Amino acid sequence: MNYTGYLLAFQLCIILGSSSCYCQADLFKEKYKLRNIFNASDSDVADGGLFLDILKNWKEESDKKIIQSQIVSVYFKIFDNLKDNQIIQKSMATIKEDLIAKFFNSSSSKLNDFPQKLIRTPVNDLKVQRKAVNELFKVMNXDLSPKSNLRKRKRSQSTFHGRRASI
């Protein structure tokens, strides 16, 4: 890469970095705006956490991601409940956009999996029950868990380590 290419790459990094700083500043501003509107720093909300107490019990990173996505879904329910409040609409939209990007990789299909597909599963429907029982062993089996892939990877690596090339 020549000098001009390095200069253009550097400028691109500066532009991208400054735009993300601007977005973070805007996000903090909207959070504090909501905090002030709801008087969320008052002593009546200081009697214990709502979600943080739950989150403290989850230690593993993958477990935390699961519970955080559940908590984010609750925030979205709260935002939907307040959607008619014009004063906080921009703040909620900004925060919701950031949450979708962070926890659902900006994927609307992932966002809708939990609240629309899982929670609203008609558990009294016989066909649903039959499908659930049919999939039960696949869900519980190591086929879908990350640990099974790790075991397979370790197993395949150990077979390669056991073989030595003869000269």
Swiss-Prot record:
Residues 148-167 are annotated as: Disordered. InterPro entries: 4_helix_cytokine-like_core, Interferon_gamma. GO terms for molecular function: cytokine activity; type II interferon receptor binding. Residues 149-167 have a biased composition (Basic residues). SUPFAM superfamilies: 4-helical cytokines. Residues 1-23 form the signal peptide. Glycans are attached at N39, N105. GO terms for biological process: adaptive immune response; defense response to virus; humoral immune response; positive regulation of autophagy. It comes from the Eukaryota. Pfam families: IFN-gamma. It is found in: Secreted. Released primarily from activated T lymphocytes. Keywords: Antiviral defense, Cytokine, Glycoprotein, Growth regulation, Pyrrolidone carboxylic acid, Secreted, Signal. The modification Pyrrolidone carboxylic acid is found at Q24. One of its GO terms (cellular component) is extracellular space. Type II interferon produced by immune cells such as T-cells and NK cells that plays crucial roles in antimicrobial, antiviral, and antitumor responses by activating effector immune cells and enhancing antigen presentation. Primarily signals through the JAK-STAT pathway after interaction with its receptor IFNGR1 to affect gene regulation. Upon IFNG binding, IFNGR1 intracellular domain opens out to allow association of downstream signaling components JAK2, JAK1 and STAT1, leading to STAT1 activation, nuclear translocation and transcription of IFNG-regulated genes. Belongs to the type II (or gamma) interferon family. Homodimer. Interacts with IFNGR1 (via extracellular domain); this interaction promotes IFNGR1 dimerization. This is Interferon gamma. It comes from Dasypus novemcinctus.
